[in-house]
């Protein structure tokens, strides 16, 4: 037998073995799964928008099903009860993260987003302490200042009758909030959006986002073919790290323990200056994830207002009924009195959830979900946030903020009925939960920031900045497209899902 035949026999054996391994059942309670191919598993079933592919598979295989993404055994959750099992009820068993190579380069698994449970506990405690000691009023002031700067820039476009290109300006807005909050730095009002700090951050960010989750994360033998792209990717990540390190070192020199000026000062004090790498990586988490999530949601808000002029008109009328026609700036105190506006933001989160698959998790031990399905140790878990907001609501592709108003009214009526049942000593149905039970239960099926202890730590800040910029854009400008054409609302998948770039015609109100 010559060497070539030996290699061919080995490859054939490997293919057959891998096919059997990927398709064998561990127990009678395994989640359902389509047939997996050897080597690639179910990668062929994923499109350029994997959240949509996974949602289509959920229509066939149900709210909990399994796939092999390359060699990674994965369970996809598009079920309310199972979602709660993973994020809350069995949180500790699903608290770890998978460790793909692309993420190792970014965080070394020491930051906040991708650290395993033990490291995450320490880091979360550190960040929570720093956030608690930083006054909420300070955050609100930072957000309002950046909102004013953005509106001023938009006014310049409106006065010149020029089309406004929202992406770079909303990116600058989102970055500035995080830079101000973390480091007391900002990209200057008159600083070009194409040069300086903006360029130094956005180019590495954009390149880093393109690499995360690529095929060589799941098929190890392809790594040699990605050698040069991986090398360039590492360079971009190190550029971001060195940018952060410069700021950290300067803060350490200027630190006043009695008067910390920003979140980075608080983190250095809380860590006693002993966790430099962790603190820097936490800052990278905020910059990489937070800025993109906020920017994407703000872009979708503008797009859906343009495509739904009746919604835009109704929201504006509500806003001026609260703030008055002479008001030129909406504050956080105004927002709570604008239920229709809040419903628009919630509908944006539902229909185009910025993180459609959340952050993946890993099961630490063998376990069973509340529906009886078996999850073996080491299984990757994908939380299909997009799918729940799509499959479990009526008319999912329709942008209907009214559904949230109606839902709130229905919930209030339901609570009154339940209270009446209790008063009448009637039994309340406690049948086993199912997706059918939760259909159109919007607060349960729409979870853009996930649930449980490992949800988004910056959720409150993200919501405040989104509410501020969106309400003030609405107050100051009527938004429309070129020639009043409908803007394409098909998404582009990435760390967040973004619309294709578009331009806005701004009409000053």
From Swiss-Prot:
Q: Where in the cell is it found?
A: Membrane
- Keywords carried by this UniProt record: Heme, Iron, Membrane, Metal-binding, Monooxygenase, Oxidoreductase, Transmembrane, Transmembrane helix
Principal localization reads membrane
EC number, as in UniProt: 1.14.-.-
Write out the transmembrane intervals: 1-21
Q: Which InterPro entries match?
A: Cyt_P450, Cyt_P450_CS, Cyt_P450_E_grp-I, Cyt_P450_sf
Determine if Transmembrane helix is one of this entry's keywords. Answer: yes
Topology relative to the lipid bilayer, per the entry, is: Single-pass membrane protein
Q: Report the SS bond pairs.
A: none
SUPFAM superfamilies, per the entry: Cytochrome P450
For this chain, the family text in UniProt reads: Belongs to the cytochrome P450 family.
Q: What is this protein called?
A: Probable cytochrome P450 519B1
- Give the species this sequence originates from: Dictyostelium discoideum
What's the gene? cyp519B1
């Amino acid at each position: 037998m010559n060497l070539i035949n030996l290699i061919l026999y080995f490859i054939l054996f490997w293919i057959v073995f891998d096919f059997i391994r990927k398709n064998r059942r561990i127990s009678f309670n395994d989640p359902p799964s389509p047939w997996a191919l050897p080597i690639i598993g179910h990668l062929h079933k994923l499109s350029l928008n994997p959240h949509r592919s996974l949602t289509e598979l959920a229509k066939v295989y149900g709210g909990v099903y399994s796939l092999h993404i390359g060699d990674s055994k994965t369970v996809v959750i598009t079920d309310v009860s199972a979602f709660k099992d993973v994020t809350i009820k069995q949180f500790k068993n699903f608290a770890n993260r998978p460790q793909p190579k692309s993420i190792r380069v970014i965080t070394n698994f020491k930051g906040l987003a991708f650290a395993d449970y033990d490291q995450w506990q320490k880091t979360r405690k550190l960040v929570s302490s720093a956030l608690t000691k930083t006054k909420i009023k300070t955050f609100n002031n930072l957000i309002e200042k950046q909102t004013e700067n953005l509106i001023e820039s938009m006014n310049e476009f409106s006065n010149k009758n020029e089309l406004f290109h929202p992406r770079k300006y909303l990116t600058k807005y989102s970055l500035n909030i995080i830079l101000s909050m973390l480091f007391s730095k900002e990209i200057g009002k008159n600083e070009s959006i194409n040069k300086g700090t903006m360029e130094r951050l956005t180019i590495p960010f954009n390149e880093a986002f393109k690499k995360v989750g690529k095929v060589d994360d799941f098929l190890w033998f392809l790594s040699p073919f990605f050698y040069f792209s991986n090398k360039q990717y590492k360079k971009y990540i190190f550029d971001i790290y060195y940018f952060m390190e410069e700021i950290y070192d300067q803060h350490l020199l200027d630190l006043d323990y009695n008067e910390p000026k920003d979140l980075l000062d608080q983190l250095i004090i809380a860590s006693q200056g002993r966790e430099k790498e962790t603190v820097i990586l936490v800052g990278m988490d905020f910059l990489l994830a937070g800025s993109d999530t906020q920017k994407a949601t703000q872009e979708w808000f503008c797009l859906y207002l343009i495509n739904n002029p009746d919604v835009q008109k109704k929201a504006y009328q509500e806003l001026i009924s609260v703030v008055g026609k002479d008001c030129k700036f909406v504050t956080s105190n105004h927002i709570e009195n604008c239920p229709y506006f809040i419903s628009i933001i919630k509908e944006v989160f539902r229909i185009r959830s910025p993180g459609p698959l959340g952050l993946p998790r890993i099961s630490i031990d063998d376990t069973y979900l509340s529906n009886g399905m078996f999850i073996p140790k080491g299984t990757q878990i994908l939380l299909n946030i997009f799918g729940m907001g799509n499959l479990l609501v009526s008319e999912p592709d329709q942008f209907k903020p009214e559904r949230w108003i109606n839902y709130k009214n229905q919930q209030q009526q339901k609570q009154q009925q339940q209270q009446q049942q209790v008063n009448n000593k009637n039994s309340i149905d406690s049948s086993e939960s199912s997706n059918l039970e939760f259909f159109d239960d919007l607060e349960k099926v729409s979870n853009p920031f996930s649930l449980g202890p490992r949800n988004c730590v910056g959720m409150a800040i993200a919501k405040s900045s989104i509410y501020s910029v969106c309400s003030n854009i609405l107050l100051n400008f009527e938004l429309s497209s070129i020639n009043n054409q409908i803007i394409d609302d098909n998404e582009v998948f990435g760390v967040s899902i973004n619309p294709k770039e578009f331009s806005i015609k701004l009409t000053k109100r």
